[in-house]
Amino acid sequence: MTYLDKILEHKRKEIEALKPQNFKKQFESQAENLPAPRDFAAALRRKAPSEPLRLIAELKKASPSRGVMVHDFKPLEIAERYRTLGASAYSVLTDEEFFQGHANYLKAVRENFDLPVLRKDFIIDESQIYEARLLGADALLLIVAALSPEALLQFRELAESLGMSALVEVHSKPELDIAVACGATIIGVNNRDLRTFKVNIQTSVELFASYPNDVIAVSESGIKTPEDLQQLADAGFDAVLIGEGLITSERLAAYGWNEK
């Protein structure tokens, strides 16, 4: 069983346990009082090749491959640090079992900062999309490897109908083709293979050649040096999603994120 299989197996049980909360019904009763979503797509698009990559700064306490990375995890303090670095958006892990994230982390960041916030989780049921909107998410992650093409299309359309953006994640050319066919306007290449958790940044570089011109291009995971960033910028990416590297690498933190 792969890492992804284990995560999805647990996620199905988790969703079943949460069904009585009926997030769709909650959303329908609260919709008029929810704050309008922020424009995640506009925050990510580079307007010219001379501009620096946009930064989606990720708040991540732990991962299946690394264990706990931030023992004294204070989401608001981390979010403030990322803001001063020049982040364009936040990514907040809400998976509890494998990444020690929490829905309350997303809610707190959204309520205390002005940047768009992405819900980073394994979305496999429409109830999670309504929950994301209730939490204040401006965007959510849809992973091609975790969904059928039909579910991917359905979930993207539902997210957008609720005012959120969908960051559709791929790891291969066939997955990219599926993302494009489903009408994705923001496509991220995960340099980490979710089946093995091995990382190769060249995955992004190789797949970019197959991107449609009008799609916002994001590279995710394994970005460790300014040289990595330059390679991705030269390839044509709009944005990168980085978490651990911003904490562990002063050179990454010093990249000209503020020079927009």
From Swiss-Prot:
Pathway: Amino-acid biosynthesis; L-tryptophan biosynthesis; L-tryptophan from chorismate: step 4/5. The keyword Lyase applies. SUPFAM superfamilies: Ribulose-phoshate binding barrel. Coiled coil: none annotated. Belongs to the TrpC family. InterPro entries: Aldolase_TIM, Indole-3-glycerol_P_synth, Indole-3-glycerol_P_synth_dom, Indole-3-GlycerolPSynthase_CS, RibuloseP-bd_barrel. It catalyses: 1-(2-carboxyphenylamino)-1-deoxy-D-ribulose 5-phosphate + H(+) = (1S,2R)-1-C-(indol-3-yl)glycerol 3-phosphate + CO2 + H2O. It comes from Chloroherpeton thalassium (strain ATCC 35110 / GB-78). GO terms for biological process: L-tryptophan biosynthetic process. Keywords: Amino-acid biosynthesis, Aromatic amino acid biosynthesis, Decarboxylase, Lyase, Tryptophan biosynthesis. Disulfide bonds: none annotated. It holds the Pfam family IGPS. NCBIfam families: PRK00278.2-4. Its EC number is 4.1.1.48. This is Indole-3-glycerol phosphate synthase. GO terms for molecular function: indole-3-glycerol-phosphate synthase activity; phosphoribosylanthranilate isomerase activity.
